[in-house]
From Swiss-Prot:
Catalysed conversion reaction: guanosine(527) in 16S rRNA + S-adenosyl-L-methionine = N(7)-methylguanosine(527) in 16S rRNA + S-adenosyl-L-homocysteine
EC number assigned by the record: 2.1.1.170
Organism whose genome encodes this protein: Haemophilus influenzae (strain ATCC 51907 / DSM 11121 / KW20 / Rd)
Protein name per the record: Ribosomal RNA small subunit methyltransferase G
Function field: Specifically methylates the N7 position of guanine in position 527 of 16S rRNA.
Main subcellular location of this protein, as a coarse class: cytoplasm
Subcellular location: Cytoplasm
C-alpha cells in the first residue's frame, strides 16, 4: 500500500514526510477495519480508499487559507483527517451527527496521535462554536445553498466556505443567497480518479 500511496502523492505533486505517509496508511487500515463492523463508507477496497478518500481530500490542501477549519458532515473524517495529518500546524474541528462516525474519529485521533483535531457530535445548526473559523469545509452537502444556509454561523467575517464537489453546476450559484459570492472554482486533479472534481470557494 505504501508504494501505491507514494506513487499517487508524486502524481499529485504533494510532498509530505515519511511519518505523514505512514499516518495516512494507518488511517486507511483503521477505516478498513472499522468499516467491516460499522459501515462507514461504501468504498470497501483499501487501495481504492487511497484514491477516493485520501488523495481526494489532500488535493484541497494548497487552497486552504488560515489556521482554523471545520469539516461539516465529516462522516469518517473526510476530508478533515487527511488534511489534519499533512497540516499539523492547522486546527481542525470535525463535526458529524452520527455517533459511530465520531467514535471512529476519536479512535483515529488516539491511534494516529493527532493533536490538532477536535471531534464534535452535533447537528450543524445546533453547534455554536466559541470561536469562528477561517474556513468551513464539506464534501457532504448536496448544494451550495444548503451549505451556506446550514453553516452561515460558522465562518469568521472574512472566512471562506470550501465545497468539494463532483461536476460543477452553474445553476447552483443562481440559488445562492445574494450575500455570498463565488471566489474561485478550481478543477481538481485526483490521480486515478475517474470523473470530475471541483473545489468551490465562496464567502
Amino acid at each position: 500500500m505504501k508504494a501505491k500511496l507514494v506513487s499517487l502523492l508524486a502524481q499529485a505533486n504533494i510532498k509530505i514526510s515519511d511519518q505523514q505517509i505512514q499516518q495516512l496508511i494507518n488511517l486507511v487500515n483503521l477505516l478498513n477495519k472499522w468499516n467491516k463492523a460499522y459501515n462507514l463508507t461504501s468504498v470497501r477496497d483499501p487501495q481504492e480508499m487511497l484514491v477516493k478518500h485520501i488523495l481526494d481530500s489532500l488535493v484541497v490542501s494548497p487552497y486552504l487559507q488560515g489556521d482554523r477549519f471545520i469539516d461539516v458532515g465529516t462522516g469518517p473524517g473526510l476530508p478533515g483527517l487527511p488534511l489534519a495529518i499533512i497540516n499539523p500546524s492547522k486546527q481542525f474541528v470535525l463535526l458529524d451527527s452520527l455517533g459511530k462516525r465520531i467514535s471512529f474519529i476519536r479512535n483515529a485521533i488516539r491511534e494516529l496521535r493527532l493533536t490538532n483535531v477536535t471531534p464534535v457530535l452535533s447537528r450543524v445548526e445546533e453547534y455554536q462554536p466559541e470561536d469562528k473559523f477561517d474556513g468551513v469545509l464539506s464534501r457532504a452537502f448536496a448544494s451550495l445553498k444548503d451549505m451556506t444556509d446550514w453553516c452561515h454561523h460558522l465562518p469568521k467575517e472574512n472566512g471562506y466556505f470550501y465545497a468539494l464537489k463532483g461536476i460543477y453546476q452553474e445553476d447552483e450559484i443562481n440559488e445562492l443567497n445574494k450575500k455570498y459570492t463565488i471566489q474561485k472554482v478550481i478543477e481538481l486533479s485526483v490521480p486515478e480518479l475517474i470523473g470530475e472534481r471541483h473545489l468551490i470557494v465562496l464567502r
